[in-house]
Amino acid sequence: MNQSEVEIVIITGMSGAGKSVAVRSFEDLGYYCIDNLPPVLLPKFIELIEGGIDKVTKVALVMDLRGQSFFDELFKAIDELNETPASRLKIQILYLDAKDSKLVQRYKETRRTHPLAKGGLPLEGIQKERNLLEEIKGRAQQIIDTTELKPLQLREKIMQRFAGNDRQAFAVHFVSFGFKYGIPIDADLVFDVRFLPNPHYVEDLRPKTGLQTEVSSYVLKWKETKQFVEKLTDLFDFMLPHYKREGKSQVVIGIGCTGGQHRSVTLAEYFCAHYEAKYDAYTSHRDINKRKANSR
């Protein structure tokens, strides 16, 4: 980040998806944090920031749902700021999401009432909120699915994505998963590798994962795997620079096999190793331990 540049992260998303954890994480990263700033005040706040108030260079703003007009004002403010030629601001939206069933579970556990729920039925409020937030989710530069994340894991993910913003301008996140458990909702691109030879049918490899050499060597040795890797590398080499040029701060690439244990893990690790010298590349393996957990 340039010394004169001011980074502003707008934190929003579904109620119960982890915004409170997120803002505490940004505070620990040294961001100047404000909770529930009305969008109508955003331009005035930015004016103070650009005037050099307290020499603030990193800001995180939490903006919750207050109705459609609330976000109309937010979009208008962001568009006006982005159209200012001399602006030294870097504004991005971080959207926190989770599956409806997980949000319902969290509301039941905390015994809180959803702000849009009538009669205390959280699912009704969640569905209304999801519809209202559809546009802002579409404009978000970063989306984090917190369905399977504990608070500490969400904190670690935010730290991983934002701690290095002063040194890295573009991150590539390769996430392996199993199609039987659903597609990651925060993935920008999804690739299906279920056509590759499956180590699950090799008795010695079945209990192992793609993090182990025996499995990765098996997956990568096949002609079809080598051809696929070559073609996908060509695609990534073409697409990633364009994503970066368009101002996207991160691309999440989902690679899925049946259970998320062997093939997808192998290829996520392969591509991460291939691109880590060029980009801020990292991996996560969403479903790598689910088969073991389900067999207990």
Swiss-Prot record:
Keyword ATP-binding appears in the UniProt entry: yes
Binding site for GTP: D64, L65, R66, G67
Binding site for ATP: G13, M14, S15, G16, A17, G18, K19, S20
GO MF annotation list: ATP binding; GTP binding
Family matches, as InterPro entries: P-loop_NTPase, RapZ-like, RapZ-like_N, RapZ_C
Keywords attached to this entry: ATP-binding, GTP-binding, Nucleotide-binding
Biological role stated in the UniProt entry: Displays ATPase and GTPase activities.
Family according to the record: Belongs to the RapZ-like family.
Name under which the protein is recorded: Nucleotide-binding protein ABC3036
Organism, as annotated: Shouchella clausii (strain KSM-K16) (Alkalihalobacillus clausii)
